[in-house]
């Protein structure tokens, strides 16, 4: 059975939504949950019927969102440090944390190490498109990149799309300010030339192409990726709020809204980041899923499902093998 370490107290809202998410996940599929935190606080939240799937790793300190990520290595008593350490010692198969994302990345990179051939790990996240989903990476791990980094991100993203998203030949593109090969800055142009070696590379793509369903994996540096991610979150929230405002304007609008309510629910579910749970940190020697600090129980549940699927695959081995083809 898969063993998942969960940073049980690291999110913005404390342990309650995290534990609720763990319980929902356990009701859907069996796995062993190692809750990292204060067991005196956590144990009363666990129903007896699920106690057999729960273990505890004592940790009484939380790495604050206000702390600098570079300080994560100094305090070995925090929940995130102990969770990552369990993975390093191979006592668990994966880690899920809604705590300080910078600390998670720093600890995972320095404690677990990088995969062979990877110079920098990347955070990958799923973005909804009109057909299914697009994998976008990097979305925050590396604000400054070299062309070789983006090439490695491309390989990692392609393997993830093939193994986890079950896309046999994932269409891979590079984010730029135009589709033409000559467009972009020096980083984009150099990266484009490297990515041409990859058979599934379809060229440059613009920001709007994320949503047209014609790209499976889109590669960019962590600065651009994070800006895109946060902008999309804001746009989605604004659109749904505007729709709510318009519906309230007249009786006819309210009747119309009732008629299409099921469609709106499906749309909201498709565009809701909580449905995707978390973002895998690709390129480290292990499985680390980084969840949003504001994750509710549904997001935690889905992040755990991601961790289970990742752990049941051989994705890290496949990434190293794929990179080896180009480095030989």
UniProtKB/Swiss-Prot annotation:
It is an enzyme of class 2 (transferase). Its EC number is 2.3.1.274. It comes from the Bacteria. SUPFAM superfamilies: Isocitrate/Isopropylmalate dehydrogenase-like. Keywords: Cytoplasm, Lipid biosynthesis, Lipid metabolism, Phospholipid biosynthesis, Phospholipid metabolism, Transferase. Catalyzes the reversible formation of acyl-phosphate (acyl-PO(4)) from acyl-[acyl-carrier-protein] (acyl-ACP). This enzyme utilizes acyl-ACP as fatty acyl donor, but not acyl-CoA. Belongs to the PlsX family. This is Phosphate acyltransferase. The gene is plsX.
């Amino acid at each position: 059975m898969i063993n998942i370490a969960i940073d049980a107290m690291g999110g913005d809202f404390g342990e309650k939504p995290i534990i609720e998410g763990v319980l929902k996940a356990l009701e859907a599929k069996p796995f062993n949950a190692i809750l990292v935190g204060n067991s005196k606080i956590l144990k009363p939240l666990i129903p007896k019927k699920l106690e057999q799937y729960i273990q505890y790793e004592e940790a009484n300190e939380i790495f604050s969102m206000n702390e600098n990520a570079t300080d994560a290595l100094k305090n070995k008593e925090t929940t995130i440090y102990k969770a990552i350490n369990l993975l390093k010692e191979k006592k668990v198969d994966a880690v899920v944390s809604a705590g300080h994302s910078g600390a998670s990345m720093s600890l995972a990179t320095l404690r677990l190490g990088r995969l062979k051939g990877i110079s920098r790990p990347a955070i990958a996240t799923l973005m909804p498109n009109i057909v299914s989903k697009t994998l976008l990476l990097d979305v925050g791990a590396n604000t400054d990149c070299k062309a070789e980094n983006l090439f490695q991100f491309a390989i990692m993203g392609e393997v993830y799309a093939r193994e986890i998203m079950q896309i046999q030949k994932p269409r891979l593109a590079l984010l730029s300010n135009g589709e033409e090969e000559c467009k972009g800055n020096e980083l984009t142009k150099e990266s484009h030339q490297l990515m041409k070696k990859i058979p599934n590379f379809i060229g440059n793509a613009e920001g709007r192409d994320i949503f047209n369903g014609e790209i499976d994996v889109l590669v960019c540096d962590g600065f651009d990726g994070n800006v895109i991610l946060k902008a999309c979150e804001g746009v989605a929230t604004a659109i749904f709020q505007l729709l709510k405002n318009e519906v309230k304007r007249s009786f006819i609008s309210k009747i119309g809204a009732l008629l299409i309510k099921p469609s709106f629910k499906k749309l909201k579910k498709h565009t809701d980041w909580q449905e995707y749970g978390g973002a895998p940190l690709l390129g480290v020697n292990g499985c680390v899923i980084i969840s949003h600090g504001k994750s509710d129980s549904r997001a935690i549940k889905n992040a755990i499902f991601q961790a289970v699927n990742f752990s049941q695959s051989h994705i890290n081995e496949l990434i190293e093998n794929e990179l080896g083809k180009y480095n030989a």
